[in-house]
A protein has these predicted regions:
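Short glycine-/acidic-enriched loop or helix-start segments at secondary-structure transitions
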Residues: 16, 41, 59-60, 89-92, ...
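Short glycine/proline-enriched coil/turn segments at helix->beta-strand junctions
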Residues: 25-26, 38-46, 74-78, 95-100, ...
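Rossmann-fold dinucleotide-binding core
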Residues: 52, 78, 84-152, 221
Length: 251
C-alpha cells in the first residue's frame, strides 16, 4: 500500500482524491484541509500532493509563507506542488525547506474538474517510479520542475490571449457590419484552430476572461517577462480585457 497525503481538498485536490478512490485501491489517502473537516495525520505518508491558495500580489509576486510552513512540517517524502507557482519556485522551496519539492501542474476547469482529471495526461517532474504506481494506466510526460512551471503559465496565459483575440475579432466584425457567428464558424472550418476559448461571450455569459486563474496568471507572467518579446506580446493583455469585460476584483 502507498500512503498518499493530499493537502488542500478544493477542486484540484478533490479531483485527485476522486480519481485515486475510483482507480487505485493500493493507495491509502490521508487528507489535510481543516476548513473542510479533513484532519488526517500525515506523519506516515510516502508522498504528498499540495494544492492550496497562494495569493498573487499586484506586482506579480506570490506569498509563499503558508506553503513553506506546510512543506516544512511534512515528513521527508517527495512533495508535489499543484498550485500555480512562478517559474523557479520549486527549486527555491526545495532549498529553503530541505524537502524534495517537485511540481505537477493541473489543467482543470472548475465546472468539469472531475471529468478533466480523468482524461488528462499527467506531468511528472520527479519520483517517477512511485508516481507510476499511483497513477496506474495514466499517460504521462516527464520534465523538470522549471519546465513544468513554465508549461502551466504558458498554457493559462495562452488561454487568456485566445479569449482576448476572439473578443477583439468579434468587435471588429461588428464594426465592419459582418456577422460574427458566420465568421467564427468559418475560422474553425480548417480544424487547425479548436473551438476552446473562441466563443464570445464565454461560458459565463460575459465578454473577456475571468475566473480565479487567468487574471492572476496573466498579471504575474506579464510582470515576469517584462523586457522580453514575450513580455511585449503580453503588455496590453490585461487592459484589453478590462476594455471588454470591465474591472473585476480578484483575490
Amino acid at each position: 500500500m502507498i500512503n498518499v497525503g493530499i493537502i488542500g481538498c478544493g477542486f484540484v485536490g478533490g479531483a485527485l482524491k476522486d480519481w485515486l478512490e475510483h482507480n487505485n485501491p493500493e493507495c491509502n489517502l490521508f487528507i489535510s484541509d481543516p476548513p473542510k473537516g479533513y484532519n488526517d495525520d500525515l506523519s506516515n505518508i510516502d508522498i504528498a500532493f499540495l494544492q492550496i491558495h497562494v495569493p498573487t500580489e499586484d506586482d506579480g509576486t506570490q506569498d509563499l509563507t503558508l506553503m513553506k510552513q506546510l512543506i516544512s512540517n511534512l515528513p521527508d517524502v517527495p512533495v508535489f506542488v499543484r498550485t500555480t507557482i512562478l517559474p523557479g519556485t520549486s527549486e527555491m522551496l526545495s532549498r529553503e525547506t530541505k524537502h524534495q519539492v517537485c511540481y505537477m501542474p493541473e489543467f482543470l476547469t472548475e465546472r468539469t474538474f472531475i471529468e478533466d482529471f480523468r482524461k488528462q495526461t499527467m506531468v511528472f517532474t520527479g519520483a517517477q517510479d512511485l508516481l507510476t504506481k499511483i497513477f496506474v494506466g495514466k499517460k504521462f510526460t516527464v520534465m523538470t520542475p522549471l519546465e513544468a512551471e513554465l508549461t502551466k503559465y504558458m498554457h493559462n496565459v495562452f488561454g487568456a490571449y485566445k479569449v482576448t483575440y476572439f473578443n477583439a475579432c468579434r468587435e471588429y466584425c461588428e464594426q465592419m457590419g459582418a456577422d460574427w457567428r458566420k465568421v467564427h464558424t468559418g475560422i474553425l472550418l480548417s480544424g487547425y484552430i479548436n473551438d476552446t476559448h473562441t466563443y464570445v461571450p464565454g461560458p459565463d455569459g460575459k465578454l473577456g476572461y475571468g475566473g480565479k486563474c487567468f487574471p492572476k496568471d496573466v498579471n504575474a507572467f506579464a510582470k515576469m517577462t517584462v523586457g522580453t518579446p514575450l513580455g511585449t506580446l503580453l503588455e496590453h493583455l490585461h487592459e484589453l480585457n478590462v476594455h471588454f469585460r470591465g474591472v473585476e476584483e480578484h483575490i
